Each structure stands twice: as C-alpha cells, then as structure tokens.
Amino acid sequence: MRSTRLISIYPGILITGFSILDFQKSKIKLIAYGVIKPKKKDRIEKRLLHLHDEILSIIKKFDPSVMAIEDSFYGKNVKSTVILGQARSVMMLAGAKLNLDIFQFAPRKIKQSLCGNGSASKEQVQFMVSSILKLESLPTPIDITDAMAVGICFVNNYNTI
C-alpha cells in the first residue's frame, strides 16, 4: 500500500506555517516544514500574491495529493478575519490549480483531534505534535507546529472524511 502525501497549512498574512507529511493508515512521517513570510511593508495584494506563489512552488516541489488547512476563526476584529480569509483563499486556489483535495479544519477540531480537548493550550498542542512526530526539538516559530497539528488532524480523521 502506497503512502499519501499532504501539505498542511497554518495560514497567516505575516507568517504562514506549512508542513509536508507522508502517511499510511496512522503512521506519519515528517518530510519537510517551514514558514512563508511576505514582507510587512508590502501592500496586501503583494503579500497575497507572495503566499499564492510560494504555496504553488512548495506543492510543485513536494507533489502532495491533499491539502489540509486551518479554517478561519471568528474574532472580534472583523478586518483581521477578512484578511485571514483572503490569505486562506489564495493558498487554497494554489492547491485547486494543481488538483489537490482540500480539507479545512476548525481550530477547536484540531485541538480536539490531537489533545482530546477543543480548548487545549498552544503548549499542549505543541507537546502532542512533538510526541506524535518524534521531534527532537520544537521548530520555531510556533506557526510551524500549528501547521503540523493541522496535518495530524487530517490523518486522524482521514477514514471518516
């Protein structure tokens, strides 16, 4: 049986974390990870283009068949929520262009899947990611382990999707 490769994304307009994971049933192997950081001084449309182009490049390099991305949370700042939605959209568009199956997970679902508690802290999520992927040290910034958590959530829910 062949393993499935996925790109998992923790979206942000300033820092986007990503990871590439291979999995077969419940066995997960970390292939690569990193961050995409558009320039803060750039206008929003340039940052969105940068996110799109970088995700497209990563997908072409690693050839995943699935994208798992964290869904937007609904905060008090409407403008921030809209901008995050735009960032998510351009990354999902990159995946759609290359025919990836795209799955979205709410933050609470990700925490529930990894920690058994939808209100788990960032530290609890990091601990579980580190344990599951057998990381020697936690990558920084935290956006990377958040992206890994999205991918693990997909794997944990793969047979029910």
What is the predicted role of each segment?
Residues 1-161:
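Phosphate- and other anionic-substrate recognition elements at nucleic-acid/protein interfaces
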